[in-house]
Amino acid sequence: MAGVMETDEQARQRFQLELEFVQCLANPNYLNFLAQRGYLREKPFVNYLKYLLYWKEPEYAKFLKYPHCLHMLELLQYEHFRKELVNAQCAKFIDEQQILHWQHYSRKRTRLQQALAEQQQQQQPQAPSHANTTSK
């Protein structure tokens, strides 16, 4: 039944489901599961992944808790990547790379925050001493 408008409640539910699903794409083991079950070879599913690219728009991306899911969504647009995901070693490699990225990101962010805090402390103006230097 084409042309039927969805209710606000239906739109909210669809938004929630698509948000959850897109974020699941950040999990390489889930991607491996989808590939091994054949979903990534099905044209309707591949078309759905293409449809979900709207999540890259800032008005939608701001709701994502795991923004690297967008990178996975982008990679899933390529047939070669979808085929490689059948291999558990591929999923394991992606998982390891994600862990390394977050470890490096966390350390770098902590160092940056410490450096900024030190810089702010050094830039704070010192209170002038109020020595009585009035001359008559």
From Swiss-Prot:
Predominant location: nucleus
Pfam family, one: Med31
Keywords: Activator, Nucleus, Transcription, Transcription regulation
Disordered: region residues: 117-136
GO cellular component: core mediator complex; mediator complex
Subcellular location: Nucleus
Molecular function in Gene Ontology: transcription coregulator activity
Regions crossing the membrane: none
Gene3D superfamilies: Mediator of RNA polymerase II, submodule Med31 (Soh1)
Gene Ontology biological process terms in this record: regulation of transcription by RNA polymerase II
Low complexity: bias regions: 117-128
Quaternary structure note: Component of the Mediator complex.
Its job: Component of the Mediator complex, a coactivator involved in the regulated transcription of nearly all RNA polymerase II-dependent genes. Mediator functions as a bridge to convey information from gene-specific regulatory proteins to the basal RNA polymerase II transcription machinery. Mediator is recruited to promoters by direct interactions with regulatory proteins and serves as a scaffold for the assembly of a functional preinitiation complex with RNA polymerase II and the general transcription factors.
Recorded family membership: Belongs to the Mediator complex subunit 31 family.
Name of the protein in question: Mediator of RNA polymerase II transcription subunit 31
Native source species: Danio rerio
Lineage: Eukaryota, Metazoa, Chordata, Craniata, Vertebrata
